Amino acid sequence: MSSGLIYISLEVLVACLITALIMYYVMKKIYYARGQAALKSASAKAKLMEFQAKSFVEAEEVRMKSQECKLQQQYENKNLQLKTHFEKKEVHLKHLEAQHKEFVRDEKRYLEKEKKELEKERQILEQEKENFKKQRVVCKEAQAKALDAMLNYMAYTKDEIKNMILEQLEEELEAQKSALIRRYEKEAKEEGKKKSYAILAEATARFAGNYATENLTTRIALPCSDYIGRVIGKDGKNIEAFKKVSGVDIEFSEDSSELCLSSFNLYRREVASETLKILIEDGRIQPNRIEEVYHRVARNLEKELLSEGESVVLELELGAMEDELKILIGKMRYRSSFGQNALQHSKEVALLAGLIAEQLGGDKKLARRAGILHDIGKALTQELGRDHVNLGVEVCKRHKEDPVVINAIYAHHGHEEILSVECASVCAADALSAGRPGARRKSDEEYAKRMQALEEIALEFDGVEKAYAMESGRELRVIVKSNQVRDNQVPIIARKIAKKIEESAQYVGEVGVQVVRENRFKTTATLKQ
């Protein structure tokens, strides 16, 4: 019994050992297979990473090559541009050099011609001097013979006869002297006239400028006809707000493709034009938005005036100049006289005056400075309403400008005599610039003066802040200060302005006077959570 149990136990033990061996073998196979699989997976991942790295490197190489090609192309383009620019500069410099050489040759020929003429005149004078000496000897001989004859036949003493002959000779010599003086004066005037014509002709031939006249309207294209409704606004609130803040008339074309801004004041029209362009581009057109954009554009334009003046000073090579004068030069861009832009006219005068002064032996730089500043007072006439000559003299004296500049401001309107070559050059250049065909339009200037006169009448009254002449002078819109004028005073001011216009105006028609008084209160609400 016990031996049988032992046998069974041995069998069980052997079976367990065999099972354990089998399990060990199977597990070993499984772990080996898993290891192989993991190894293959790691190898595949390594190959994938290697492939990705290689692809990335190749892509980077392609990108770098593309970038290199692009940079190379940019370098070549820039090099080509610089080369073209320098070639143009070189051609321009050669052209200037050729012009200078031609000018020097012309001057040399002119001087040689003058020298020959002077030598010829000197020889003539020498010949006349010799002839005069010979005639004097002949006269003395004739005088002696006549004296002897008269002493023989007349009852005069020798001294009396001598005095008679001397008086007669003196009268004859005085007559000859007067004739010679008149002849030389005539020749000098003719020669001076020819030379002045030659100088003016050469100055105008060497000057090349842009000739442009100012219109009284500005046209702005509309993206589509729907914008007409946006600009007008509900019940016309937008267009009324725009007219009120800008003082500019606005009209629409028949085909609704554009609108037209009309004002004699170039600066006011420029601000209004830029404001309307921004509003149309943005699409948000509301009364508050209109006022906000208008004031922002006005501030930006004021800042640009100094930059504009500095550009003109650099262009004309005038050297140092006070900032106030530069700002006033920039402001002249928005002023006109008889339809001619004031800044363009002043630049023309400066360039022409420099050329003329150079020909006459004057200071070219000083003549240019006097030319650009001769109408500087026009930048202040719309604000101060006084004569531009006196305004220009005041501002130039305040900044201690050269007396030649002051003399040019006075002399170009005949308030003073011309005291220098530079001043004469400015006066001649001013006449050339203003007198050329098509430079000025008298009708436009008369219209602008009529509009400005209406605004000046309104601004004379106490409490008036702004005044805008609109609708071609048929309407005068006046804005009064709410802290100085009460509501019951508004009709009285309107009637007074209308009466003053009736007394002052010299043209037929009606002018509607609209006086506006407005109070605004602004506060800020703070929101708390």
Swiss-Prot record:
A matching Pfam family: KH_1
Membrane topology: Single-pass membrane protein
Keyword Methyltransferase applies: no
UniProt KW Metal-binding keyword: no
Subcellular location: Cell membrane
GO CC, any one term: plasma membrane
Enzyme Commission number, as recorded: 3.1.-.-
InterPro entries: HD/PDEase_dom, HD_domain, HDIG_dom, KH_dom, KH_dom_type_1, KH_dom_type_1_sf, Ribonuclease_Y, RNase_Y_N
A GO biological process held by the record: mRNA catabolic process
Molecular function terms from GO: RNA binding; RNA endonuclease activity
Name by which UniProt lists this protein: Ribonuclease Y
Species this chain originates from: Helicobacter pylori (strain HPAG1)
Lineage: Bacteria, Pseudomonadati, Campylobacterota, Epsilonproteobacteria, Campylobacterales
Name of the encoding gene: rny
